[in-house]
Amino acid sequence: LSEALVKLPGMKLRESGGVGSDMQLMLDGFSGKHVKIFIDGVPQEGAGGAFSLNNIPVNFADRIEVYKGVVPVEFGSDALGGVVNVVTNKHRRAWFLDASYSYGSFHTHKSYVNWGQTLKNGLTYELNAFQNYSDNDYHIHNWVREFELRDDGSIRFPPIDKTDVRRVKRFNDTYHNEAVIGKIGVVDKPWADRLMLGFTYSRFYKEIQTGVRQEIVYGDKLRRGYTI
């Protein structure tokens, strides 16, 4: 969804790397907590990294509503910069299936499926699921500081030569996220046009790479999280 958002006037997006990298959304100069993200009117502050806008596939949304300045009352009053509301597909056909899969560089896999059915008695159910995976083992150009181990076991830090720029390959930077949204309810009833009960589950796995200018080196560090 992030690629679709940046085409809107006043919208800017900054990412710090490959798939699963940190993202900062700017709306007319406002960013961070001043711009609120919603999915079908539900705030996503505690939904976890799997529901970051740069991880959600574009098939997931029917449309994207962007409010600048004046924000509708249902989104609260603390969004000084504005609101981005992702409205998901609400299929009304008897049966539907939408699926996609893509493969890219650095062992990047992205997949999405949206499946559901509406019965004649008004009972309806729907399942949305998507996942993103990438090794993020691309090359970068930067100067590298070599450490020297002395005979006594101590480490010598030689002067940094910033003219010695090398092409190095990133490692320990794998990212993987999964999300499942299930809904069940009724439609077209005298007492309700649409009444749904849903659940959401997501998880992410993010490896942390040692920085190219880092003096204290750590290995195989990662972050992971789950939401339900």
Q: What is the role of each PLM region?
A:
Residues 58-100:
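A beta-strand signature from Gram-negative outer-membrane beta-barrel systems
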Residues 19, 76, 104-107, 168-177, ...:
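Short sequence motifs at beta-strands and strand-loop junctions characteristic
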Residues 28, 67, 87, 114-118, ...:
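Transmembrane beta-barrel domains of outer membrane proteins
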Residues 7, 34, 42-69:
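Short acidic/polar hinge/loop motifs at secondary-structure boundaries
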Residues 93, 102, 118-216:
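Periplasmic-side early beta-strands and strand-to-turn transitions of outer-membrane beta-barrels
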Residues 23, 82, 95, 109-113, ...:
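Hydrophobic, lipid-facing positions within transmembrane beta-strands of outer-membrane proteins
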Residues 2-43:
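Extracytoplasmic beta-strand/coil segments of soluble accessory domains associated
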